[in-house]
Regions:
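Interfacial loop-to-helix transition and helix-capping segments at the boundaries
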Residues: 2-3, 24-34, 112-126, 166-189, ...
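Transmembrane alpha-helical segments and their boundary/interface "anchor" motifs
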Residues: 9, 34, 38, 50-85, ...
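Aromatic-anchored segments of alpha-helical transmembrane domains
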Residues: 14-21, 104-108, 154-166, 222-235, ...
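Membrane-interface helix/loop caps of multi-pass membrane proteins
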Residues: 17, 61, 96-135, 176-179, ...
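Structural signal for the C-terminal ends of transmembrane alpha-helices
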Residues: 46-53, 84-87, 136-144, 193-202, ...
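Membrane-interfacial, low-structure loops and terminal tails that flank and connect transmembrane helices
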Residues: 60-61, 200-214, 268-274, 341-353
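Hydrophobic alpha-helical segments with transmembrane-like composition
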Residues: 105-161, 198, 329
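Alpha-helical transmembrane segments of multi-pass integral membrane proteins
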Residues: 187, 191, 215-336
């Protein structure tokens, strides 16, 4: 496990949560956070089941294993969201419910469908698609030479930007932010990042960083953090078709690669990220992501009923309640179901063939 990346999950999931609490004034948080998790997924999956094990990787067993980790919580949060709707007299059509149950909602170009019930769950539909094509995509990307990779990447970026500029602004959110065949670019970047991470040049870089003083490593860490801050500052001035995804195709890989490389260094930021509290918070990042929208609805409704009008205090309560609930949800629901499934052989303990 790369401890720094594990803890960064919490940092970036909180950017997503804050974007949903603040609204359009902080769209950066949501789009940056989603890009991070898509790219990180490609990188971590490649790291875990990379070239040595490629020929023995079982897509079916792996997807089954991952579904048991997140699908029960997806159904639970959707049920809670539907119950909240029912209290308001809102009863959705089956045409909106079924795609979410089947995890294909992000393939349907309607906000009423892909943001249905527990809105953040659209992310799962994309991730499942990435898991299904991982083995093939990994093989293709790793057989390409460096020159082929550079040429193909340059052509892809040019085509993406040209076509993106032609998309009406009201369709950008779906076609460039949600649509799985487009967001697979982020996932592929994660796979390519794995190639760079496993290269001899990275080994040399890691060896050099290990000889640096903690103060020098801390300076480099703060420079990378500053890169994220700078990106946030220029974000509002960038065209929607760029800032929704492609804006992060450089900065997020830099963050992932850098912190993966210095995972065991003595820098201040690394020490913070590898601390026990941050590791614990990193372990509940998925649960935070899945429940925060439902918690937000419940807390806001309660605040309205008791006459609390301060948006700041409401946001603080939402964050604290979400984090507090995420721990028992993980321990007593997500992990418990997964462990029971392992005992009864509903999943393969070893996903390799």
């Amino acid at each position: 496990m790369l401890h720094t990346l594990h803890s960064l999950r919490f940092v970036f999931v909180m950017l997503i949560v804050l974007s949903h609490l603040i609204g359009h004034g902080f769209d950066f948080g949501g789009e940056c956070g989603v890009a991070f998790f898509f790219i990180l997924s490609g990188f971590v999956l490649s790291l875990a089941y990379g070239s040595v094990r490629e020929n023995r990787f079982s897509t079916r067993a792996f997807v089954r294993k991952q579904l048991l980790k997140f699908y029960p919580l997806h159904l639970l949060t959707m049920a809670v969201a539907l119950a909240l709707d029912a209290r308001l007299g809102l009863y959705p059509e089956w045409g909106r419910i079924i795609p979410s149950i089947l995890l294909v909602q992000s393939w349907i170009p309607s906000e009423q469908v892909y943001f249905f019930a527990n809105g953040p769950a659209w992310f799962l539909a994309d991730i499942v698609f990435f898991y299904l094509i991982f083995r093939c995509l990994f093989a293709v990307l790793n057989k390409m030479s460096i020159r082929q990779t550079i040429v193909a990447s340059a052509l892809l970026v040019i085509v993406y930007l040209l076509l993106g500029s032609l998309i009406p602004e009201d369709r950008v959110n779906y076609l460039l932010y949600v649509f799985p065949p487009v967001r697979v670019i982020d996932f592929a970047i994660g796979i390519l990042l794995y190639r760079a991470y496993r290269s001899r040049h990275t080994e040399s870089l890691r060896s050099w960083l290990n000889t640096c003083s903690p103060a020098w490593v801390t300076a480099l860490e703060l420079a990378v953090v500053a890169l994220i801050v700078l990106t946030a500052l220029i974000y509002p001035h960038i065209e929607p078709h760029i800032r929704c995804a492609s804006m992060f195709w450089v900065v997020i890989p830099v963050v992932v690669f850098f912190f993966a490389t210095i995972d065991k260094s003595g820098g201040l930021v690394t020490r913070l990220l590898t601390s026990r509290p941050m590791m614990a918070l990193g372990s509940i990042s998925f649960e935070i992501y899945m429940i925060h929208a439902v918690v937000k609805r419940i807390v806001q409704s309660t605040a309205m009923n008791v006459g609390i009008e301060s948006n700041v205090w409401i946001a603080i309560v939402i964050i604290l309640v979400t984090i507090a609930l995420a721990f028992p949800v993980k321990i007593f629901f997500v992990d418990k179901i997964y462990i029971k499934a392992s005992k009864f052989r509903y999943i393969d303990k070893n996903i390799e063939k």
